[in-house]
Amino acid sequence: GDTTTSQRGFVISITAIGEVAPDMYVKRDGAKVNDLVCVSGDLGGAFLGLTILEREKKIFEETGAQPDLEDRAYIVGRLLKPEARKDVIEYFAEHKITPTSMMDISDGLSSEMLHICKQSNVGCVLYEDKLPLNEDSKDFAYKLELDPTACALSGGEDYELLFTVAQTDHEKIAANNGLSIIGYITEASEGKTFITRGGNKHELVAQGWNHLK
């Protein structure tokens, strides 16, 4: 899925290959009705990090002023230094949790959730007030007059884990502060629903959800 370009003709592309026991192999198509929908970490920061860098690049080109990103180090780091969530996989192993489906969030929460629903032939309900949003991300989003929820739903490049688990694993997931339960799986006929903080229901769509609609 990688398309790489270089202004100087030099590219480094790395592929990692691993092994897994057959009974531990988790795909996208195993989500079951009533499973819990969960994510690791927080969402939307990488998109905002990109927004900061693009803004500072424009300022530098126009004025020559060097960017001061010290107070936005976390957000910029979310874009430039994504981390593989090996700690989450280790937590699963330690607590004997086997997700029914899982994938990383590269194109935004909405898009990845719809992938799981399609391949598992299920629907879902997600709750806005359950989405994990970092305070720095929210603060900067508001300063740019952006919706933090929309950044989480459609920003992408967060590389957190989106996964589903059986309800019997609820306590194990809830005990980890780095994991959030954001919804549940439904029958496919019930569709894919996003419920706002105000209780309004909207169809979950790949480009995210717009507060102004």
Give short role names for the model-derived ranges:
Residues 1, 21-26, 87-88, 110-111, ...:
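Glycine-rich, charged/polar anion/phosphate-binding loops
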Residues 1-56, 184:
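Glycine-rich anion-binding loops of enzyme active sites
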Residues 66-115:
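Polyanion-binding loop/helix "lid" in catalytic or ligand-binding cores
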Residues 5-12, 17, 94, 99-213:
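Glycine-/charge-enriched secondary-structure boundary and capping motifs
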Residues 29, 40-42, 77-81, 102-105, ...:
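Glycine- and other small-residue-rich loops at beta-strand/loop junctions that grip anionic moieties
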Residues 22-27, 60-65, 123-126, 172:
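Phosphate-handling active-site elements
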Residues 49-69:
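Short, compositionally biased
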Residues 18-21, 41-47, 54-57, 83, ...:
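Short, well-ordered alpha-helical segments in soluble proteins
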